[in-house]
Amino acid sequence: LLLLSNSGKTREIVELLELSKRMYPDIPAIVITGNAQSELAQNAEIVLFTGGAPEICPLGLTPTTSTTVMTIIGDMLVVGLMEKIGFTKEEYAKRHHSGYLGSKSRGEIH
């Protein structure tokens, strides 16, 4: 289970982890957060700490820097997993059956 919360305090995410632990205790939780001391991080099996960089929003409120860092970490996880399991264009095409990406993965668009 992959959970993302910069503060580590997002109520819905904390509650989701609690529910997951009750219903599916054997599924490990991976948390990406800017607050490694948060309740969310403390209850996860794996914590990927973003460094807690300040948001570039002039008000310091809107998630900006944190969402970019989380996207990069997520992309790294996906690419690493694709390489590990040998994910192919054919597998990709099965999941993108229409549209531009589906056509490109099947070699219909160059």
Predicted regions and their residues:
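Glycine-rich phosphate-binding loops that contact phosphosugars or nucleotide phosphates
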Residues: 1-85
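Internal, active-site/partner-interface "lid" segment
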Residues: 56, 83-110
